[in-house]
Amino acid sequence: AYFLAASPDRKTLYVGGAFSTVNGAAHSRFVAFDIASGQVSPLVPNLGLNGSVKAIAASGDDLYIGGAFTSVAGEAHSRLAKLSLAGGQFALDSSWRAGASDEVRDLVADPLSGRLIVAGWFKSLDGYTSSGHLGAVTLASGGLANWASHPGYEVLDIARCGTKLYAA
């Protein structure tokens, strides 16, 4: 596993990585566990990701995943995807179209500003090179958000503390 994230209600643990099975069942690079029982949760079906998941962020009934994948559930998604809870399971939100030119390593969802902060090895975010290595897209549509940073090097980890964002 590359990344672990708890749901906002602390009842579910989301796990991303490069695995293809969990307990003998197909789970392509992303799975959820019920924290109380330790069992695989039916919340996340096998999404058929073609590359690893290295970042997960939760916001309300939505999950955002990032990594090295270019396909989710048979649809082209360049290293970023949004999953929305519907009918007791998370499903791919096909209308959310954010994309990064290279691997995404970390995500921070900021519901107050409506932005998803994205960090990684990419040189462009949603086609804009000024967002290299660290940028933001909107939680709602995945379009480039009005936020910019120019770290000049790859950002592998980000953390928010109050109104400040720290990057390493």
Residue positions per predicted region:
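Extracytoplasmic surface signature
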Residues: 1-168
